[in-house]
């Protein structure tokens, strides 16, 4: 009888290790130690290429220019929002004041029995006409430019600010702002004073009221007959009181307007000087970097 063949070797048998078991377990341990899943025998990654000094200068300059471009876009957006706010304020103020002037001119009732001074009616009519014309001009500018600025400001895109006409129409926007706030307001104050004179001047002293400039011993009939010859009537007193109140208010308004304009110009001038100093500092740093590059290239040319 032939002997039975030996069973095949089993990998799980600890008494019969495989010839390649040690290398397999070693490779597994090396993978666990390495942590990145790559065998230790793999070649290392090549180092990043060295950046030359001119390339570094170019990269730094491009980064600074990109930051400068973003700051310019932010400045353009601020100007756009400022122009939009000015146009909105001008349109509201002009519509309100011009409407009030028109209503005041229409609703005023002139006394046909009273002899008005010829210059009073002329000045009142001219002031009302100029007031309405100035405010309507400012309202027309606001109505024409504001929709274009609103259409651009509602688009959520940084580059859309270039499509807005606020830079090109800057003079028109400032003109509308000046007409509505400065000239229009001064004309409105003058309109109020003239309206008081036109409205209250026909009022005369009643028959039983004595004249304040004459003794009260005179008869009432004589006072009534001589009321037009001397003294101040109640209408004149009311008009003078309104004028005395409005003149200091007008002076205060003018002083405030001049002070506000000077403060605003001073603020803008300081901002311009600050931006110029920043540009000068940037130019100085750029010049230093350029000279440093020249110094770094000089020894190589010397040894060559």
Curated annotation (Swiss-Prot):
Site entry: Confers selective permeability to Ca(2+) ions: 107
Recorded topology in the membrane: Multi-pass membrane protein
Ranges for region Disordered: 1-49
GO BP terms: adaptive immune response; calcium ion import; calcium ion transmembrane transport; ligand-gated ion channel signaling pathway; mammary gland epithelium development; phospholipase C-activating G protein-coupled receptor signaling pathway; positive regulation of adenylate cyclase activity; positive regulation of calcium ion transport
Chain positions covered by the region annotation Interaction with STIM1: 71-91, 275-295
Modified residues (Phosphothreonine): 298
Renumbered residue ranges of the record's region Required for generation of inwardly rectifying CRAC currents: 3-49
UniProt activity-regulation remark: Oxidation at Cys-196 leads to inactivation of channel activity.
Pfam families: Orai-1
Molecular function as annotated in GO: calcium channel activity; calmodulin binding; identical protein binding; store-operated calcium channel activity
UniProt entry tagged with the keyword Phosphoprotein: yes
Region (AKAP5 association region) location: 39-60
Keywords associated with the record: Adaptive immunity, Calcium, Calcium channel, Calcium transport, Calmodulin-binding, Cell membrane, Glycoprotein, Immunity, Ion channel, Ion transport, Membrane, Phosphoprotein, Transmembrane, Transmembrane helix, Transport, Ubl conjugation
Low complexity: compositionally biased ranges: 12-27
Glycosylation sites: 225
Domain of life: Eukaryota
Transmembrane segments: 89-106, 121-141, 175-195, 238-258
Cytoplasmic side: 1-88, 142-174, 259-304
Family matches, as InterPro entries: CRAC_channel, Orai_sf
A GO cellular component entry from the record: plasma membrane raft
Coiled-coil positions: none
Assembly notes: Oligomerizes in homomeric and heteromeric ORAI complexes. Native CRAC channels most likely consist of hexameric ORAI heteromers, implying that diverse ORAI1, ORAI2 and ORAI3 subunit combinations with distinct biophysical properties can operate in a cell-type specific way. ARC channels are heteropentamers consisting of three ORAI1 and two ORAI3 subunits. Interacts with STIM1 and STIM2; this regulates channel activity. Interacts with CALM; this may displace STIM1 and STIM2 and might thereby modulate channel activity. Interacts (via N-terminus) with AKAP5 upon store depletion.
Family: Belongs to the Orai family.
Protein name as catalogued: Calcium release-activated calcium channel protein 1
Lineage of the organism: Eukaryota, Metazoa, Chordata, Craniata, Vertebrata
Gene name of the encoded protein: Orai1
